[in-house]
Amino acid sequence: MYQPPDAGHWTGRIDSVKDERAFRLHQRIRLLDLSQPLETAAERAAAFIGFACDEGVRRNQGRQGAKEAPAAVKAALARLPWHLPEGVVVYDAGDVVCIDERLEQSQTELGKAVARLLKNGMASIVIGGGHETAYGHYLGVREALGTDARLGILNIDAHFDLRPYDDGPTSGTMFRQILDQDDQVSYFCLGIQRLGNTAALFADAETYRCRYMLEDELTAGPIEAAYEQIEKFAADHDAVMLTFCMDAISAAAAPGVSAPSPFGLAPSLARALIRRIVSHPKTISVDLCEVNPLLDEGGKTVALAAAFCMEALLHFQRLQPRR
């Protein structure tokens, strides 16, 4: 079910009502109701769309609570300072909410919302929700691109999420679903934990010809090796979407997730990967998933997720001034 944006999420400290250099995001955000006809987007525009759903996590035997994340992350974003270039417009496009365990219907609805934003010329940032968010996100990107475009999916994650879906989709099946139904998609996962995936899942990754880099490869560096692989991957595709699972981050920095990672990525390393990926001209859309405010400690996971979303905004190549 679609819910229009809630202005109540966008409040916070006010340092000035006149000096725009002192503004925060809550003073610049615009509300966009997708149930109404869309205005023509600014030349450089982006929109947040929430996916309040953790039904996929429940089906995957995980710990629920991620459906609370869109509201919490938006409230944390509201307080961050505005550093975007002049002329950029940022919208809150509301939320798609999963009702009565209707995961598949909700993913379809999210896809329609994302497609509408992209077709209107906006960059989209989807705030999940469990990682089942990524499937709905993909549906929207594919609709916007058309059936023939080669799409690269970059996933920053501790897990492959290539589980079988004989008993229905979950938060651990979506990339297998996508690869089974779309031969114009390739998949590259950064941050894989050897102790977070069975030998069967590593075998499945080989079967599906997935590219991946282990967490310890990324941590040992140099990061330029990852950058080189990202560039090669993007070069093979017409467009790229980024999906980011917060359980890729070390549990010390991101305890508020369903499946915390004791040997996860450092936030600064993840930030560098986000910056590199979204600054590529082929990257058109981003999602961030698996924040669970009910399991968080002092709001640190929510705050980190909001910072990652802002980093995506700041470095989206399509939001930079035209030269």
UniProtKB/Swiss-Prot annotation:
GO biological process: L-histidine catabolic process to glutamate and formamide; L-histidine catabolic process to glutamate and formate; putrescine biosynthetic process from arginine, via agmatine
Claim: Transit peptide is one of the keywords in the record: no
Annotated Mn(2+) 1 binding sites: 131, 157, 161, 245
Keywords: Histidine metabolism, Hydrolase, Manganese, Metal-binding
Free-text cofactor note: Binds 2 manganese ions per subunit.
Catalytic activities: N-formimidoyl-L-glutamate + H2O = formamide + L-glutamate
InterPro entries for the chain: HutG, Ureohydrolase, Ureohydrolase_dom_sf
Keyword Metal-binding tagged: yes
PANTHER family in alphabetical order: ARGINASE/AGMATINASE, FORMIMIDOYLGLUTAMASE
Name this protein carries in UniProt: Formimidoylglutamase
